[in-house]
Amino acid sequence: MSDKLKERKRTPVSHKVIEKRRRDRINRCLNELGKTVPMALAKQSSGKLEKAEILEMTVQYLRALHSADFPRGREKAELLAEFANYFHYGYHECMKNLVHYLTTVERMETKDTKYARILAFLQSKARLGAEPAFPPLGSLPEPDFSYQLHPAGPEFAGHSPGEAAVFPQGSGAGPFPWPPGAARSPALPYLPSAPVPLASPAQQHSPFLTPVQGLDRHYLNLIGHAHPNALNLHTPQHPPVL
């Protein structure tokens, strides 16, 4: 009799555990979708998205990727530029977070050689990927990547005092505007006190694509050949930074 009572008590508990795990899996997957789908990622800064919104944006995004009637000509170029916009936005967000981590958690100083090498490597990759890749958009102004030092603005006041700002002059223009509704990342510090060694020519011409080049080629193949196999993305690799 006591064994039966124990079994009855265990049943609802195990059911609750199963339900909790199921909800956790759903929430985890929705969270990943919110970070993966470009439209959802761009709206994260404006507040928390509802689950239904994330699912709707995911459906729209997948329909656009699988559509056999992809727009051609200028419309196609604008679509590719939009994909590149989201990549650049995410890239600069990652750079901002890395800089904040290095200066606040690791307590690195901006004159630290290792810190300067990391920033130089990331900025060199950003410059390589920011070149216009879409000829139909050639009428837009070329971005200026002459990185010049300037004081940090008020938007960066919440970070550590050592994080002085540096960004391309005239960064508001160029072929890659910030996604609508997304807050621009604060400027990044770059104050090396010594010459910064960059990657060697052999490393810069490595067989691996830079992230932006891989992204552009992926979507060019996707639009040219609307086929499920075109959705295979390979993680880009780079030579070690340090």
Swiss-Prot record:
GO terms for cellular component: chromatin; nucleus; transcription regulator complex. Residues 10-65 form the bHLH domain. Pfam families: Hairy_orange (PF07527), HLH (PF00010). Gene3D superfamilies: 6.10.250.980, Helix-loop-helix DNA-binding domain. It is found in: Nucleus. One of its GO terms (molecular function) is RNA polymerase II cis-regulatory region sequence-specific DNA binding. It comes from the Eukaryota. The modification N6-acetyllysine is found at residue 48. Keywords: Acetylation, DNA-binding, Nucleus, Repressor, Transcription, Transcription regulation. Disulfide bonds: none annotated. Belongs to the HEY family. Self-associates. Interacts with HES5 and HEY2. This is Hairy and enhancer of split-related protein HELT. It comes from Homo sapiens (Human).
